[in-house]
Amino acid sequence: MTNLLNNWLIINQFGYDLPEPWQLGLQDAAHPVMEEIIFFHDQVMFILIIIITTVLWLIVKALSGKAYHRYLVDGTLLEIIWTIVPAIILILIAFPSLKLLYLMDEVMDPALTIKAIGHQWYWSYEYSDYQTETLEFDSYMVPTSELNKGDFRLLEVDNRLVVPINTHVRVLVTGADVLHSFAVPALAVKMDAIPGRLNQTGFFIKRPGIFYGQCSEICGANHSFMPIVIEAVSLDKYINWVLSGSDE
């Protein structure tokens, strides 16, 4: 219990966004689309609870009641009701779902473009929007034996993907060898990295923090050992990071 409490304090104090022990809900949203997804999830769960409660009540009432129609074989009004009501419920669920699908695919006028390339078993990133030479680096998982106090096992990397907050970021995703998947739950990002094909996704991070993800496509023996870490910082810190990276 002490370890769980310490992990919870570390996660909340330093702004880390990753799954928590015994977590039942979704991660805190840092991207407007993720906020919409959580809201839609809550709506669907509310509808589901109402349906389950109603059906259970009808079952209990039917089994416990003494009055029943032994020879009732049809009821036009009843059939109309149980056809129309589910149809309306499905429509109410479908329209917000379609809206979210389009929002997740739309990349709005990006101010920054990053290329993420999946390898067996690490990620490489390229920043090519600047007049200087392309800023590129590889990102490997930090082995358990080299973790520092407060680091997270199987989630830490040696080089984080650094982006500015309040900025539309586009990520071009591809694979160098086999299928991979670039996924960061807190940002509602999941895009397949396919060799020979360039896919795109985007996000708009609203607050500083460190956001953890992983490859979400089985890609070989070390599939579980290629995490993704995105560090969102202020624009000034991001510019300093770019300048320091360009000088190296």
UniProtKB/Swiss-Prot annotation:
<keyword id="KW-0479">Metal-binding</keyword>
<comment type="subunit">
    <text>Component of the cytochrome c oxidase (complex IV, CIV), a multisubunit enzyme composed of a catalytic core of 3 subunits and several supernumerary subunits. The complex exists as a monomer or a dimer and forms supercomplexes (SCs) in the inner mitochondrial membrane with ubiquinol-cytochrome c oxidoreductase (cytochrome b-c1 complex, complex III, CIII).</text>
</comment>
<dbReference type="Pfam" id="PF00116">
    <property type="entry name" value="COX2"/>
</dbReference>
<feature type="transmembrane region" description="Helical">
    <location>
        <begin position="80"/>
        <end position="99"/>
    </location>
</feature>
<keyword id="KW-0186">Copper</keyword>
<dbReference type="GO" id="GO:0005743">
    <property type="term" value="C:mitochondrial inner membrane"/>
</dbReference>
<keyword id="KW-0496">Mitochondrion</keyword>
<dbReference type="InterPro" id="IPR036257">
    <property type="entry name" value="Cyt_c_oxidase_su2_TM_sf"/>
</dbReference>
<dbReference type="InterPro" id="IPR011759">
    <property type="entry name" value="Cyt_c_oxidase_su2_TM_dom"/>
</dbReference>
<keyword id="KW-0249">Electron transport</keyword>
<feature type="binding site">
    <location>
        <position position="215"/>
    </location>
    <ligand>
        <name>Cu cation A1</name>
    </ligand>
</feature>
<dbReference type="GO" id="GO:0005507">
    <property type="term" value="F:copper ion binding"/>
</dbReference>
<keyword id="KW-0812">Transmembrane</keyword>
<feature type="topological domain" description="Mitochondrial intermembrane">
    <location>
        <begin position="100"/>
        <end position="248"/>
    </location>
</feature>
<comment type="similarity">
    <text>Belongs to the cytochrome c oxidase subunit 2 family.</text>
</comment>
<feature type="binding site">
    <location>
        <position position="223"/>
    </location>
    <ligand>
        <name>Cu cation A2</name>
    </ligand>
</feature>
<feature type="binding site">
    <location>
        <position position="215"/>
    </location>
    <ligand>
        <name>Cu cation A2</name>
    </ligand>
</feature>
<keyword id="KW-0999">Mitochondrion inner membrane</keyword>
<keyword id="KW-0460">Magnesium</keyword>
<keyword id="KW-0679">Respiratory chain</keyword>
<feature type="binding site">
    <location>
        <position position="180"/>
    </location>
    <ligand>
        <name>Cu cation A1</name>
    </ligand>
</feature>
<comment type="function">
    <text>Component of the cytochrome c oxidase, the last enzyme in the mitochondrial electron transport chain which drives oxidative phosphorylation. The respiratory chain contains 3 multisubunit complexes succinate dehydrogenase (complex II, CII), ubiquinol-cytochrome c oxidoreductase (cytochrome b-c1 complex, complex III, CIII) and cytochrome c oxidase (complex IV, CIV), that cooperate to transfer electrons derived from NADH and succinate to molecular oxygen, creating an electrochemical gradient over the inner membrane that drives transmembrane transport and the ATP synthase.</text>
</comment>
<dbReference type="InterPro" id="IPR001505">
    <property type="entry name" value="Copper_CuA"/>
</dbReference>
<keyword id="KW-0813">Transport</keyword>
<protein>
    <recommendedName>
        <fullName>Cytochrome c oxidase subunit 2</fullName>
        <ecNumber>7.1.1.9</ecNumber>
    </recommendedName>
</protein>
<dbReference type="GO" id="GO:0042773">
    <property type="term" value="P:ATP synthesis coupled electron transport"/>
</dbReference>
<feature type="binding site">
    <location>
        <position position="226"/>
    </location>
    <ligand>
        <name>Cu cation A1</name>
    </ligand>
</feature>
<feature type="binding site">
    <location>
        <position position="219"/>
    </location>
    <ligand>
        <name>Cu cation A1</name>
    </ligand>
</feature>
<feature type="binding site">
    <location>
        <position position="217"/>
    </location>
    <ligand>
        <name>Mg(2+)</name>
    </ligand>
</feature>
<feature type="binding site">
    <location>
        <position position="217"/>
    </location>
    <ligand>
        <name>Cu cation A2</name>
    </ligand>
</feature>
<dbReference type="GO" id="GO:0004129">
    <property type="term" value="F:cytochrome-c oxidase activity"/>
</dbReference>
<feature type="transmembrane region" description="Helical">
    <location>
        <begin position="44"/>
        <end position="65"/>
    </location>
</feature>
<dbReference type="Pfam" id="PF02790">
    <property type="entry name" value="COX2_TM"/>
</dbReference>
<dbReference type="InterPro" id="IPR008972">
    <property type="entry name" value="Cupredoxin"/>
</dbReference>
<keyword id="KW-1278">Translocase</keyword>
<dbReference type="InterPro" id="IPR014222">
    <property type="entry name" value="Cyt_c_oxidase_su2"/>
</dbReference>
<feature type="binding site">
    <location>
        <position position="219"/>
    </location>
    <ligand>
        <name>Cu cation A2</name>
    </ligand>
</feature>
<keyword id="KW-0472">Membrane</keyword>
<feature type="topological domain" description="Mitochondrial matrix">
    <location>
        <begin position="66"/>
        <end position="79"/>
    </location>
</feature>
<dbReference type="InterPro" id="IPR002429">
    <property type="entry name" value="CcO_II-like_C"/>
</dbReference>
<dbReference type="InterPro" id="IPR034210">
    <property type="entry name" value="CcO_II_C"/>
</dbReference>
<dbReference type="InterPro" id="IPR045187">
    <property type="entry name" value="CcO_II"/>
</dbReference>
